[in-house]
Amino acid sequence: MIKFNEPSDGQIISFKDGVIQTPDKPIVPYIIGDGIGIDVTPVMKRVLNYAIGKAYGVSKEIKWMEIYAGQQAMDICGELLPQETLDAMKKYRVSIKGPLTTPIGKGFKSINVSIRQKLDLFACVRPIRYFPGTNSPMVESDLTDTVSYTHLTLPTNLSV
């Protein structure tokens, strides 16, 4: 059984009457991931910490809690996606993961697909908009403001 180090000064994100309640110090589980995840996940955490500090000063901060999936989980407990990881993702409601390797071979389901299915995550929502000062090959790129929705649980992904 895996035991994660829950930050003692963090709080759990909750819902009240269908509205998300984000505390000042939310606990956010993260999975480092495999391959490039080892390099990009720590940078992602630094960027988010900086952005929150810039927006809220010292009044708000993420309390990070490492959880395991992929090769790291295999090394620690002998399975690629431990139930404890899924339980933590459910309990804390918001989590972030780095890229996870999918071994090649028959009969193996992608860890990413397993996470989506077991947590009933059915949509990938991606806002797309222009940021002033960035270069773009599009004409009138400053008018770009849209959202892409991809359904993730159908046998074939459907994007709108």
Label each residue range with its predicted role.
Residues 1-143:
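Metallocofactor- and cofactor-centric catalytic cores in central/energy metabolism, strongly enriched
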